[in-house]
C-alpha cells in the first residue's frame, strides 16, 4: 500500500451525484438488475491487482458502462473518469486487508479501495443498492427523494437554530453597548454559532450527494449560513482570554478546538469557556467581560479590518472606543480624519440602533 493523495469520500460522492455521467451509468445498471464492480482510478497500483480481462481505453459513456458491467469482471476507469481503461478484470487485492463485508464483490471492493487509495463502487444486484468505498470508509447511495425529505427536515431545524442565534446575538450586542457582558452571554452565542455550523455541515453533505437535484437546497443553505464563519472568528477576536488581541494562529487553534468538541461538550458552557482560555468553574460564568470591539466595528460599512485592528490595539475595549471622540480616533497612527469621523458616526449609530431594538 502506498501513502499517496487520493479522493476523499465526499469528493467520490460528488462524482456520483445525480446529473453526472457516472450516476447515469449506475442508474442504468440498477434498472438492468445486474451487479457491478467499478474502480474510479487507474495507475500501477490498480494494475497490480488486476487479473485477466481486456484493455479498452475508450471514451466513457453511461451506455458503455452498462453493457460492460453485464460481464462478471470489474470495470476500471481513468482517474478523471473520462475513459474506460479496462473491463471484465478480476480484482485480486491483498486478502490480509481486514474487511467487515460478507459478499465477495463487496469484500473485493473494500480491499481494493484501501490498497489502491481510489474509490471503488460495488453494485449489488440482489439488494439493488450502490456502495462506494474510499480508504476504509463506505457510503451507500440514497435516492434523491429520501435525501430531500431528510434535508428539508434539517433545514427546518437550521432555521430554528438560526432564529435563536440571531436572538442571543442581539442580546449580546445590547450587553456590549451597556457594558454588562458576562462569560455566560458570550458562551451562549458561541454555542449557537457552533450548533448552526454543525447542522449546516450535515445538510451540505446532503447537497453534495443530491448534485443537480440539490440546487434549491444549496441556495437555502447558503442564505442561512451566510456570515456564520465570520461571526465565529469575530467572537474569538473579541473574547479570547489572551491579554492581547489573539493572533491568526490562536484564532484558528481556538476554532479547531471548538470543532473538535463532542456534542455533549458543546452543551457545557464550562467546556466552551476552557477553549477560550477561561476558568472552568460554574461561578466563572457570571464574571464580567469587556469585548475588544472587533465584532461591533464589523457592523460599520466599508471599514477595513486593518483600521479596526489599529483602533482596537489603541483603545483596548469597545467601551474605550465608544467613549473616544473623532479627534481621539484620528490621533491613532494610520487613521485619517475621514475614517475617524466615519468610525465615530458608525459607533454612535450602532449604539442607538442596538438600544432601540430592545
From Swiss-Prot:
Its EC number is 2.7.7.85. Disulfide bonds: none annotated. GO terms for biological process: DNA repair. It comes from the Bacteria. Its cofactor is Mg(2+). The keyword Chloroplast does not apply. It catalyses: 2 ATP = 3',3'-c-di-AMP + 2 diphosphate. Belongs to the DisA family. Homooctamer. This is DNA integrity scanning protein DisA. It comes from Mycobacterium bovis (strain ATCC BAA-935 / AF2122/97). The gene is disA.
Amino acid at each position: 500500500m502506498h501513502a499517496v493523495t487520493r479522493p476523499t469520500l465526499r469528493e467520490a460522492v460528488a462524482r456520483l451525484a445525480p446529473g453526472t455521467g457516472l450516476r447515469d451509468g449506475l442508474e442504468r445498471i440498477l434498472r438492468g438488475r445486474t451487479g457491478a464492480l467499478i474502480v474510479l482510478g487507474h495507475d500501477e497500483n490498480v494494475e497490480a491487482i488486476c487479473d485477466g480481462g481486456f484493455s479498452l481505453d475508450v471514451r466513457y459513456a453511461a451506455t458503455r458502462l452498462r453493457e460492460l458491467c453485464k460481464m462478471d469482471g470489474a470495470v476500471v476507469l481513468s482517474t478523471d473518469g473520462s475513459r474506460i481503461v479496462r473491463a471484465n478484470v478480476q480484482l485480486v487485492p491483498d486478502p490480509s486487508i481486514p474487511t467487515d463485508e460478507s459478499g465477495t464483490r463487496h469484500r473485493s471492493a473494500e480491499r481494493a479501495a484501501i490498497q489502491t487509495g481510489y474509490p471503488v463502487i460495488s453494485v449489488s444486484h440482489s439488494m439493488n443498492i450502490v456502495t462506494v468505498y474510499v480508504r476504509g470508509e463506505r457510503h451507500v447511495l440514497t435516492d434523491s427523494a429520501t435525501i430531500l425529505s431528510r434535508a428539508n427536515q434539517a433545514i427546518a431545524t437550521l432555521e430554528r437554530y438560526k432564529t435563536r442565534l440571531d436572538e442571543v446575538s442581539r442580546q449580546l450586542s445590547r450587553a456590549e453597548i451597556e457594558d454588562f457582558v458576562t462569560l455566560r452571554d458570550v458562551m451562549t452565542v458561541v454555542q449557537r454559532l457552533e450548533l448552526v455550523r454543525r447542522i449546516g455541515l450535515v445538510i451540505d453533505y446532503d447537497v453534495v450527494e443530491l448534485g443537480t437535484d440539490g440546487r434549491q437546497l444549496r441556495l437555502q443553505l447558503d442564505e442561512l449560513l451566510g456570515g456564520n464563519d465570520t461571526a465565529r472568528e469575530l467572537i474569538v477576536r473579541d473574547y479570547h482570554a489572551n491579554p492581547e488581541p489573539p493572533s491568526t494562529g490562536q484564532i484558528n487553534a481556538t476554532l479547531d478546538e471548538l470543532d473538535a468538541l463532542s456534542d455533549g461538550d458543546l452543551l457545557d458552557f464550562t467546556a466552551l469557556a476552557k477553549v477560550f482560555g477561561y476558568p472552568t468553574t460554574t461561578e466563572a460564568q457570571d464574571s464580567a467581560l469587556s469585548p475588544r470591539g472587533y465584532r461591533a466595528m464589523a457592523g460599520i460599512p466599508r471599514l477595513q479590518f486593518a483600521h479596526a485592528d489599529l483602533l482596537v490595539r489603541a483603545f483596548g475595549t469597545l467601551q474605550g472606543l465608544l467613549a473616544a471622540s473623532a479627534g481621539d480616533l484620528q490621533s491613532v497612527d494610520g487613521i485619517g480624519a475621514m475614517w475617524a469621523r466615519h468610525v465615530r458616526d458608525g459607533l454612535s449609530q450602532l449604539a442607538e440602533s442596538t438600544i432601540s431594538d430592545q
